[in-house]
């Protein structure tokens, strides 16, 4: 899944672009600022996981390039599944348990949703846990200790998790004094490292500009120490937080319940018969459901990865302890059926409490869309291959991960001293509005300092020309413009017409109270907020659409200029870009016309979301063709 997502240009700057840059950086013995963060990777996460695999970079990366980290992560997931199987086989020679645990491991919902995050430290670090438990069970304590150290240094939450893992191991190995001694030692080591981590090591990485920002548990306290004190002083309130919505946003009322239900049905019910295995889930469930961010509470993205890594082992160790064979087989079947049912059910937007946290294009493997891309993949890869490995590059969200293994990579529209810019015209920076992104792209497309060297729609590659001698006053070959000043009315059906005779608006909204150019405008009030939907047929013969309108309004973000192309492309503008001497504000909405839209038609409309009336005049729609075509 991860390999295909990357190949089809679905991996994102957050996180895979940052991870690829950090991996390259570590492999070249550097510690640099990552593309989307004001600090280095170690300041974002105190983890050495990527450093473990620097030798793999030098062995494999010449061949696998930006796919290397995905290959490493997938290999660790498979290795973790293999060690989970080996542990179950230690406890039982029942062939159904062995087959069942492998099947179950890859049926759980969280195994699929985790791929929406591409590569993540949580996924990597979790894979060490079954490996450690296996070597602990077979009494290879030195090897287990080595895995413990790798685990502790892999992510900040691991030391606390290991304290509870060792408690379960003490219960499980209670007749083995040597095992108990090692487990108690493990608790002490984990606790000491956890204290040192937050008291010494993490503060050492902080600076005036960058502080550690991943302990987000305001309901408990500002630090792990404060959180522990709160839970000891207010145990009932702390337990309540595991189940209630403490965000004060009713949207997330049932998110925690959904998480518990999904994994209870997906085999977790078995643990009710062997509750000792619930113990090692306590810290990883707490880190989810007590967090300030409600999206972490539920079943979104990789936020359940620790659970789905340990749940197969827990469920099948519990099943292995059942005495009767028919009970074991029944439990295996029920767990696997529950898992596959919940996975298929919850990979559908309509079946989730918070639908927007699902990215089906990256995780819904049984959908045709999972195997398609918005790009001409081969053509875009050829385009990217022309960029020198040493060049400084500014790239947009889904392009950057493919170019991140270099000394200087920037997240467009941050250009700095870049020699190349490459972006998709639909690849918006999430912190900017659509029109802010559009204006940034057009600034460079129309600049005489940047040459469009290649393009494979919707991707453009630009090269910097420091002399600024290029003659690129316009990138368009032709433009078809229609206008409406709300003065021309059809005698036949009493509708307001565009300059080409097409219908623009109904006369019900016509007003003479205000006008910008002549005597009429249309009035949108609280009684009639919406203008007519204007259909723009056969628009795919053009490349670019620009809609301009003037409005007289009093409130901020009161006017909304909206356009749709098919079901999947929606564009919006509510901020004016200029104002004339009479107080009329100009709003512009522009976008590249999708080549793979579900329809050949686009449409537009204007609406008023405010409490006061607005007046609309001088509507202009411009359709353009690109010179390069």
Q: How does the language model describe each region?
A:
Residues 161-191:
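Perimembrane helix-loop-helix junctions
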Residues 473-629:
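Extracellular and organelle-lumenal recognition/adhesion modules and their flexible linkers in secreted
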Residues 83-86, 107, 122-148, 165:
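Specific aromatic-rich, kink-prone transmembrane helix
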Residues 96, 184-191, 322-354:
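Signature aromatic-anchored transmembrane alpha helix within multi-pass, membrane-resident enzymes
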Residues 18-27, 39-64, 230:
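Short hydrophobic/aromatic helix or loop-helix immediately within or flanking a transmembrane segment
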Residues 245, 254-281, 285:
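Hydrophobic, aromatic-rich transmembrane alpha-helices
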Residues 47-54, 66-83, 98-131, 153, ...:
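Aromatic- and kink-enriched transmembrane "portal" helix at the membrane-lumen/periplasm boundary
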